[in-house]
Amino acid sequence: MASSISHRKTRDEYKKEKELDEARKAGNAPAELDEEGKEINPHIPEYILKAPWYLNANKPSLKHQRGVTKKEMDKGWYLRGATTGEAATKFRKGACENCGAMTHKTKDCCERPRKLGAKFTNDDIKPDEVIQKLELDYDSKRDPYNGYDPSSYKEVMDIYEKADTERKKKKLQELIKQHGGGGDKKTPDVDETLSKELMDNEEKEGSYDSETVAPIQKLDQKSRTTIRNLRIREDTAKYLYNLDVNSAFYEPKSRSMRDNPLPNANPNDIKFAGDNFARTSGETKEFRDLQRFAWEAQEKGQDVDISSAPSQAALLHADFLRKKEQLKQQTRNQLLTKYGGEEHLLKQEEIDKVPQSEIYTEYSSSGKLIKGEEKIVKSKYEEDVFLNNHKSIWGSYWENGQWGFACCRQLIKNAYCTGEKGKLLREKQLQQQQQHHIQQENQQDDDDNNTTTTTTTTTTSLLEQHLNKSNEDNDKHNKKEGKRKDKKERKEKEEKLKKALKDQDEENKKSVEKDERNIKYNSLSADDYNVSEEQMEAYNLKRKRSDDPMANFKDDSD
């Protein structure tokens, strides 16, 4: 079945092979064996079981499907300083000219360069090194500690141990000086106490707990930067906030957790709400609104682009929002004027918060003050109390030494509010009182003068009539003269303006005909340097305005 047969199979051979395969699959015949004597599964497809033609496999096998066995690599390292035997006595041809060894050339020699090499002196010829051929794998070649001798580190440990013993001796001498033990004689008890104290000090210096973190940070400026850059051990990593196996919030490649890992938890208790929280903070909402406005404007045919003209887009968006707010306010005002109900939209006054105080006060169950200072009353009168439907408090109005209400100007405390009508009635009442008072004074004056002026009334009245008539005639004459003068001045002014306009036209024509470089300088030393009002008005009427949009307008319809 799986063997590569050189000759062509006959029909009967092919039929027998198929029947044998069916029997093996049904378990009626034993399974086929490979080169190593292992059974081959009869259910393996033929395209997997057949070996390629270039392998020349004469027997059924699955060897071509198995992985290539890895060659066993050396795990050791090169022997350091190993030699093959004794050194030569004479220089050999092809050896190193410096040391005389045959295993390397002169340029690769690791010996100290000699003034005269072994080639010329035949002295101190070095033995040949052992050349090893190690087949190292990928990891062995790149292992930095491959071939390292751990016993060589003992020298470093000895140096540190010597330094530690010297430090302990010095510390012990300082403790002896502190305890006043300057003499050479020492008791064993003193030595034990001092050594115990020395051990305690070393344990305290080596310990590092949460209580000593703050003092360590204030040691010097060099240690501050190091400690600040270290991550606090109490910090929780992002991926530890959500340990649900079925969730896909945390992305290890970018080390980001965009969504909230605990959506069902209380927002006040969550310390981390996802990386998307930062994207919706700050001015991101304003930028999103601006981008939406630009897209909608482009759909409607307006040229608005944030990338090419951000300032223009921002100004257009601000103008759009302002007009939108105006339109909204306009419709609101129209609805309120039509249907009313503005009083229901007013916000309630905020309740004043109780101010905090450090004064200790204690009250009894009945509400009586036991400890603390009593509150000083600002006024003996009740504040903000509106009596009898008044809109203002009692004492908001003052008139003739009496207090009253400012809303209706009532001077009686128990009176009900009469509103604006009460104000009008009060004003009328005051006017009537004033008129009545004036009439009484006039009547008293008339009664006093009636007796003295009865005889001279007729003569004085005729004289007054004559004087009044003459004064009226003079006033009429003066009015006519004034009108005549005004008319004359108006005519003179119109004539002067016409003359000034004519002169200005001539001057404009001259300035057009002449070259600008030949125009003389208008000096104030000329005779007619004083400009009149008519000349100034003519100049303003005839002056060309370049900024006027209708200056060059021509009507082509005629």
From Swiss-Prot:
GO terms (BP aspect): mRNA splicing, via spliceosome; RNA splicing; RNA splicing, via transesterification reactions
Zinc finger boundaries on the chain: CCHC-type: 94-111
Main location: nucleus
A GO-annotated cellular component: spliceosomal complex
Position of the signal peptide: none
Biased composition (Basic residues): 479-488
Coiled coil, from the record: 474-514
Database matches in Pfam families: Slu7 (PF11708)
Bias (Basic and acidic residues): 10-25, 466-478, 489-519, 545-558
Localization of this protein: Nucleus
Region (Disordered), start-end ranges: 1-41, 428-532, 539-558
Keyword Coiled coil listed: yes
Record field: transmembrane: none
Keywords: Coiled coil, Metal-binding, mRNA processing, mRNA splicing, Nucleus, Spliceosome, Zinc, Zinc-finger
Bias type Low complexity, positions: 430-442, 450-465
Subunit note: Associated with the spliceosome.
Its job: Participates in the second catalytic step of pre-mRNA splicing, when the free hydroxyl group of exon I attacks the 3'-splice site to generate spliced mRNA and the excised lariat intron.
Family recorded in the similarity comment: Belongs to the SLU7 family.
The protein's name: Pre-mRNA-splicing factor slu7
Natural source organism: Dictyostelium discoideum
Higher taxonomy: Eukaryota, Amoebozoa, Evosea, Eumycetozoa, Dictyostelia
